[in-house]
Amino acid sequence: MINLILSAPVPEMAEAFKRVFANADNVNIVGQPFETIREFDCMVSAANSFGLMDGDVDAAITAFFGTQLQTRVQNHILREYLGEQPVGTAFVIETGDNNHPWLVHAPTMRVPLTIDGTDAVYNATWAALLAIFQHNKNATTDRKIKTVVLPAMGAGCGQVPFESVGR
């Protein structure tokens, strides 16, 4: 079983997550940016299908882990998806940071656009969880993903309301 940390730095986002996940086990809501969370071994990125990680939380991920991570994500997308990763797919990649070794890239949109009213957040989140499940099936105990930080997928550029993101 993995532990989910929902990073909700906007108070309205944190409140919406608290309502939606009030009775959920293994889910913690942190009302701060992910960079303030000390213990996690995997971060989820909801960047776009081309691996551009230069806006909203993805810009913070790139600043936190370094530009090498975006380059490696894009190279993986070139190799495995011929340059364009479909929404609803996800993969696990090493970050290069021993304290936070994994990133899941799970795009919520092909290119920056409003995705409110679509099932893109659901599909990307489900794909991220499946990628973690698949990773853990084959990983040795010391390389399993145990604690995952999940941002408010689609809430930034995608303009999905916080309550909808939580559902």
Positions of predicted regions on the chain:
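Macrodomain-like recognition of ADP-ribose-binding/processing modules
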Residues: M1-R167
